[in-house]
Amino acid sequence: MLLFLLRRIFDCRYKYKLFVKALVLFLTIVYNAGLVHFFFRTTSLDDSPEMNHVDYVAHVIVMPIVLSIGMINQCLNVCTLLHIRTSIFLYLKASAIADILSIVAFIPFLFRHAKLIDPSWELGMFYHAHLELPLINALISASALNIVAMTVDRYVSVCHPIKFFQNNETKPSRRRTMLIIVMIYFIALMIYFPSVFQKKLGVVTDALTNKTIYTIVRNEDVEALQVFKFYLIVRECICRWGPVLLLVILNMCVVRGLRKIDKRNWFWRQPSQNSRTETLAQRQLRSPRDDRSRISVLLFVTSATFIICNIPASVISFFVRRVSGSLFWQIFRAIANLLQVTSYLYNFYLYALCSSEYRHAFLRLFGCRSSLSPTSTGDSPTVRVSVHGKRCHQAVVLLGNENHENPVDEV
């Protein structure tokens, strides 16, 4: 039934409107379920039962549902991308794999908030204190940085096609892409390595059972260092604000480049003034032009959703010391964390919106379409762009885009 509905949406003329409406409706339901009513219901700023209730609803009830749906979407995403041979899609594959790994890394995080862990297990508590959040945030950052790398590649192919092809001729595209992906994963892990020392284990002995219990506390000595404060600023710029600014700026440049390409192609294919009939070139160009207009809107929507999902987490990182004793900041933190994990939900659908090649690969995955490669259209990830001069140079332009997620802050 789900595959039938997806196929009907793919064949719908105004499919992007249906996807946007469904996305907005789903996000509205998720955010209102167990979160918004707390903001209007509670007024105390230091009420431990209420804060525990907020934490339980956000991280034990709502977040597992979101992550479960996100895992299904990301698995479908990876399986679909495996059927696409284009080297540029390696960035999307690497991003989706990082998302799957981060969802798996979220499982101990959820167990800890559900109080399903043994606080007397030293090795387990050591992982929760030192490795849990840095690993999650590093994987989320790797996913976001892969999208940034893909966007940079797309920007060069659209705005500087000759230089793009010169680079592809001198260096193998697939090998270069794999090297960049490995470097991105390594850089993301190195960026969050100092965060390992941000928390430490506290030891408490139960007087009744004489049992040692380990607790997670903030390492105030490390956080007070000026070097560590400078590191936090650099980390936020690289992993949060940097990807946001780059995606917005580069996507705007890509949209402008696509419009220029559309105007140039339309000018060169104009019929004579005496011709009253529509030429074959016009009929072939009209559909890609409409598709590129739709892609321009989608690029704007995806950039806006990327900012909405990640800016709250960036704000909470600057007020981390106020979170533990304030109900308002606990609610804000819960909403920020949920906003970030919702990015796992919609990127699969945005890929399907932006790329007909992706849709064809998804349908071939379930045997709904023949294995023949589809003809590239205006919304396909590979579009032939004519550069008029002495000769027509052709550039491969990636038109797909998605939002990703940035690191989660938790105190």
Curated annotation (Swiss-Prot):
Main subcellular location: membrane
Subcellular location field: Cell membrane
Membrane topology of this protein: Multi-pass membrane protein
Signal peptide: none
Ranges in the topological domain labelled Cytoplasmic: 1-18, 77-87, 153-176, 251-299, 355-411
Record's keyword terms, sorted: Cell membrane, G-protein coupled receptor, Glycoprotein, Membrane, Receptor, Transducer, Transmembrane, Transmembrane helix
Top-rank lineage group of the source organism: Eukaryota
Extracellular side of membrane: 40-55, 109-131, 198-229, 321-333
InterPro entries to which the protein is assigned, alphabetical: GPCR-like, GPCR_Rhodpsn, GPCR_Rhodpsn_7TM
Family (UniProt): Belongs to the G-protein coupled receptor 1 family.
Role: Not known. Putative receptor.
UniProt-recorded name of the protein: Probable G-protein coupled receptor AH9.1
